[in-house]
Amino acid sequence: CEVSYNDDFIDPSKTYGTARDMDPKFESNNLVDVTQISIYQSYEHSVTYKRTYGISRELEMNLNVDEKVLTNYNALFESQYKLLPAEYYDIPSSVAFGEKTASTKFVVTFYSEKLVKAVGLEEASNYVLPIRGIPATDEGVVADSASNVVLLHVQMLRPVVTVQIPNAPGKLDF
């Protein structure tokens, strides 16, 4: 089986140089499962962005939903994931690194209950939100394409209640 890689994914057989060449980057890139309970109205998922070099200045990264990333992922891994429609999530338009800050976070809000009511539990777990980070300025920033992509996979679960009955009745002292 021969596999080809495009700019959206890291080719494990290729050397990418120093960490300086891959700055900034998502803490976890490629496909990340975001596990949610189907009856919750919404679920907030925190995404971490890191950098090793250039922390002496501020940096802003624009966040875009990039359907091409999902199309390429599906072709590469022969999967059938669908793009999560915009009414089922909120993401900020950008994320900023403060001066002398090596990492920052942003929150993606998923509207779990609304999604499950619209498409059902099984179908809801077939959606992915592909996010690409793009530097607001190119000046002094080396942003590797593969490190600035994250695909958030909706992993929807049914609510479960577990009752544990003790083996022996407890002793009450008064």
PLM features: residue spans?
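Acidic/polar, low-complexity intrinsically disordered N-terminal segments immediately downstream
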Residues: 1-90, 101-105, 114-116, 120-173
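Charged, gly/pro-rich active-site loop segments
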Residues: 98
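Localized edge beta-strand/strand-to-loop motifs within extracellular or lumenal beta-rich domains
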Residues: 110-112
